[in-house]
């Protein structure tokens, strides 16, 4: 099975270490452009743009990067409850047309009650999923060309329609992740690709089986994807050293403060991430080559695959064997790691999209002694 592999645009900041200004870098448009172009150059099929008050707006960033990329797809957030489904559908169709079919959409219900309240959303966890289901129902029908009348518990629209359709037909794909029962029900009923964070394979297997069964009961099939960090080096020993360096500036107070802040979330997925490490630095390899150190201070995806190229590729194939065809990866710092993943990991994977063809003015690598073209090294 060919794999769709995406990268990540760090619109909320980037650096060489977690939880420290040491090795940190300013993230501006020029830097995001570099990361996007590096991802496209290396053969990533798309990029995930994060959402939330700590991030730049994902839609505006994606739109700004369309002219400086050729094939890269942009996975941007749909936010039920903070925007009407009609306006969101219109924006989605426009982004898809402007990018000539390179827009993908990630349904994000939100898991931080404090941040949601700041955005004017005061619904319980259960109510948010009710509203999200109504939103998604309307959004999908509009993009598929229907005129929609809908009277729900949370949303009502009358004679809603789009005058300008999307490029992708019947509509652009819809991604979604969530670990609660309500989230799985929504995924089974309405989304195209269900995302999970990087839990150990056995836990992921159970979760996918539940969603697959729920979808089958609806007469549907759902694709699957996973969100992971990756630390790949020429040797597995070097990769583990890099993992330790990434958290080398974290002290106990920083970890405790981060875990206290994340504990207020009502996201089941976030609770599952926290349970993998328990807020401690001493037992972070939770499954072979799966490391939970990033989750000590980062919300959302908190695990990384660690190893040399063949080892990480083997772990990815274990997830692929569960039915996962889409891998959304990232690494710190995101510019350098995009190249590293492309050079060390991609030769060991069957990719759905290949690196962008280059019209090079010279050979790859520096000429040896002003005479010899560098020899190609075996990937075995």
From Swiss-Prot:
Keyword field contains Oxidoreductase: yes
Pfam family, one: Bac_luciferase
Reaction(s) the record says it catalyses: an alkanesulfonate + FMNH2 + O2 = an aldehyde + FMN + sulfite + H2O + 2 H(+)
Documented EC number(s): 1.14.14.5
InterPro entries referenced in this protein's UniProt entry, alphabetically: Alkanesulphonate_mOase_FMN-dep (IPR019911), Luciferase-like_dom (IPR011251), Luciferase-like_sf (IPR036661), SsuD_RutA_monooxygenase (IPR050172)
Enzyme class: oxidoreductase
Highest taxon of source: Bacteria
Alphabetical list of Gene3D superfamilies matching this protein: Luciferase-like domain
Keywords: Flavoprotein, FMN, Monooxygenase, Oxidoreductase
Family: Belongs to the SsuD family.
Subunit structure as annotated in this protein's UniProt entry: Homotetramer.
Miscellaneous field: FMNH(2) which is absolutely required for this enzymatic reaction, is provided by SsuE.
Name of the featured protein: Alkanesulfonate monooxygenase
Naturally occurring in which organism (per UniProt): Pectobacterium atrosepticum (strain SCRI 1043 / ATCC BAA-672)
């Amino acid at each position: 099975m060919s794999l769709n592999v995406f990268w990540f645009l760090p619109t909320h900041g980037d650096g060489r270490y977690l939880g420290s200004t040491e090795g940190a870098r300013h993230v501006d448009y020029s830097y995001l452009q570099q990361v996007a172009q590096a991802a496209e150059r290396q053969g990533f099929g798309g990029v995930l743009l994060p959402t939330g008050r700590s991030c730049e707006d994902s839609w505006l960033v994606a739109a700004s990067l369309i002219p400086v990329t050729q094939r890269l797809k942009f996975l941007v957030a749909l936010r039920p409850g903070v925007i009407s489904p009609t306006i969101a559908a219109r924006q989605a169709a426009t982004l898809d047309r402007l990018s000539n079919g390179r827009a993908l959409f990630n349904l994000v219900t939100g898991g931080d009650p404090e941040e949601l309240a700041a955005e004017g959303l005061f619904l319980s966890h259960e109510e948010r999923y009710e509203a999200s289901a109504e939103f998604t129902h309307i959004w999908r029908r509009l993009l598929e060309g229907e005129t929609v009348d809908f009277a729900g518990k949370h949303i009502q629209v009358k004679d809603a329609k789009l005058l300008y359709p999307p490029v992708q037909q019947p509509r652009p794909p819809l991604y979604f992740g969530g670990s609660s029962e309500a989230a799985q029900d929504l995924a089974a009923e309405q989304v195209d690709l269900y995302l999970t964070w990087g839990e150990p394979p056995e836990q992921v297997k159970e979760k996918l089986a539940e969603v697959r069964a729920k979808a089958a009961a609806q007469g549907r099939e759902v694709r699957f994807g996973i969100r992971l960090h990756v630390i790949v080096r020429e040797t597995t020993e070097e990769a583990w050293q890099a993992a330790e360096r990434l958290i080398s500036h974290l002290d106990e107070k920083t970890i405790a403060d981060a875990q206290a802040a994340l504990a207020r979330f009502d996201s089941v997925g976030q609770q599952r991430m926290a349970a993998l490490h328990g807020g401690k630095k001493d037992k972070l390899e939770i499954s072979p080559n799966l490391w939970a150190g990033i989750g000590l201070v980062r919300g959302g995806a908190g695990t990384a695959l660690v190893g040399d190229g063949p080892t990480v590729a083997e772990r990815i194939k274990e997830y692929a064997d569960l039915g996962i065809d889409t891998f959304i990866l990232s690494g710190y710092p995101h510019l350098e790691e995009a190249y590293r993943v492309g050079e060390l990991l991609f030769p060991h994977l069957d990719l759905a999209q290949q690196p962008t063809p280059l019209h090079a003015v010279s050979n790859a690598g520096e000429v040896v002694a002003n005479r010899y073209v560098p020899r190609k090294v075996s990937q075995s």
